[in-house]
Structures are given as C-alpha cells and as structure tokens.
C-alpha cells in the first residue's frame, strides 16, 4: 500500500489501472475535485490546451511503497483557467499471470473540457506549437508561486500570464507522462469513453 510523506507532492504507488478506473467513477459521481496519482506514470494528452496562466518549476515526486520511498525528478506545472480539447488519459499495469492490462479514458476529439485550476506533476511535458503571453524565465520558484513544496524556493521557474484574457497560454498537441494530477474544480464532460484493453493503452 502506498504512503505519502508530508512536504512532498507525491505519487502514491497504486496500480495505474486502478487510478484510471477510479477516475472514471469519480467523473460519473460528479466529484467536486479529483486527484490522480500513479508511481508508474500515466499519459495525459490533448490536441489543444489553453490556460490564462502557467507556472512551471522543478521538484520531485516521491513514490512510496513496500520497498521504501524513492524520489523522482519532476516538472511541476500549475495552470489556471485551463481547457483541454480532446482530453485523453491512458494507463498501463502488469498483473501477475495475466500480463499487461491498460485503460484509455477519452472525450470525443472535438470536445472542449473546462478543467479550471490544474496542478500537474510530471516526468515530461511535450507540445507542438506553443504560444505564451507575457513570460518571465528564471524567476525564483517562491516568487513565481510554484505549488510544490519539493521545489527549491530559489530554484528555476517560468511564468506566463495572460494580460487581456484573450492572449492565452496555448499548447498544441500537449502530451505528458504524469505522476500526479490535481483538478481543483473537478470535471463536467459532454462525453466519456472508458476502454480497458489487454494491449498497451495509448492516447496516440
């Protein structure tokens, strides 16, 4: 069973499949907020991601399990006013004897999901064409307001903030390998497709 040490933004070592199926249940039950975490990491993707602001810093994700705790380097992204087009999540886990089992959770490709305030703790975040409004690079993490307590207060941070409400942070083809994702306002979806598979689940 996983555990979380205080002072760390942690990815608790639970099966990725259970995390993703639990996410589907959380959506169906209309939870006000949701936190997803997996020691193995899970894929988060969207064909288009927009936000009114983004704070990006460096920290650690602490994975704790029966064998002890391990810190993994991670990027920490705090985004506000976030909207995802074609939101997709994919997770995979290895079950003894059975082998690999994966699950893909996705909206329709054209659906725009308003996820509001988001904290993403990830091994990697990639995107294609990226538009950033007023941007400060090299600001101290404490001054930028990066949420992770594992970040060095005097360490590197990048901030980008909309000045007019229309000049948004805009990431095309965003794809992240996430350890943890917190959705402060929960989700309202116009469609939802949960697909378990015995092959490798991906958002591609």
Language-model regions: role of each:
Residues 1-65:
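Hydrophobic membrane-targeting and insertion signals
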Residues 4, 9, 24-26, 32, ...:
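Compositionally biased, intrinsically disordered low-complexity regions
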Residues 5, 20-22, 66, 79, ...:
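Intrinsically disordered, low-complexity segments enriched in small/polar residues
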Residues 48-128:
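Extracytoplasmic beta-rich ectodomain segments of secreted or membrane-anchored proteins
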Residues 111-182, 190:
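Acidic, glycine-rich flexible loop segments
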Residues 188-204:
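Short, low-complexity, Pro/Ser/Thr/Gly-rich segments in the mature regions of secreted, periplasmic
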